[in-house]
Design a protein with these regions (language model features):
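N-terminal, intrinsically disordered, polar/charged segments of Gram-positive cell-envelope systems
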Residues: 10-42
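Single conserved hydrophobic/aromatic residue that forms the stacking wall/gate
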Residues: 1-9
């Protein structure tokens, strides 16, 4: 269905964790995405006029998904793209170069979720970041979503690959401001929040 989204894991406190808010400088790293990543990594999603959403990425649980996301971020793929689908009380979805839910990157990746034969215990609770996809379980490419409210009905069908550690207030504000034109959360192109940059910090 078009209600595509993802899977994140147990969120503890998403609004405060090892982040010095007085430090406005971002240090980026260049990870080797020629092979699957492992371990925990972090990204900063800068949203124009809103601020930065800090995300922890779990490459031990979803190595293909995290490696793909990091690769695209490091290539600048997401720079200037938008959140084109916003549903208050559900999620925000972005990362489509077409800005309407029909686009993606050049390649699709395997869906890392249980109903596709992959163990993934990241539940779609508030703050989870997950991959959007079409009906094909292996159709995810660049579009991702961040869960605003617990949506565990997505568990097993979408590849959660991390969680927000700081910035859920920004997600809430984006949802609050959104004026979708239909029940599917479609946002007019001139009103879509802009992803200025996604920086991989470690």
């Amino acid at each position: 269905t078009s209600r595509g989204l993802g899977d994140v894991y147990k969120r503890q406190d998403t609004d405060s964790e090892n982040k010095d808010s007085s430090d406005s400088s971002t240090t980026s790293v260049l990870l080797d995405t020629s092979k699957e990543l492992t371990g925990i990594h972090h990204a900063e999603i800068e949203v124009k006029d809103y601020g930065t959403i800090d995300v922890e990425l779990d490459a031990d649980t979803a190595p293909i998904t995290v490696t793909n996301f990091v690769k695209l971020a490091q290539e600048g793929f997401y720079d200037g793209l938008t959140f084109h689908r916003i549903m208050d009380g559900f999620m925000i979805q972005g990362g489509d170069p077409n800005g309407d839910g029909t686009g993606g990157s050049e390649e699709n990746i395997k869906g890392e979720f249980s109903n596709n034969g992959v163990d993934n215990d990241i539940s779609h609770t508030r703050g989870t970041i997950s991959m959007a996809r079409a009906s094909d379980p292996d159709s995810a490419s660049s579009q991702f979503f961040i869960v605003q409210a617990d949506s565990t009905f997505l568990d097993g069908d979408y590849a959660g690959f991390g969680h927000v550690t700081e910035g859920m207030d920004i997600v809430d504000k984006i949802c609050e401001d959104a004026k979708p034109t239909d029940d599917n959360g479609t946002i007019p192109s001139d009103q879509q929040p802009v992803i200025e940059k996604i920086t991989i910090t470690d």
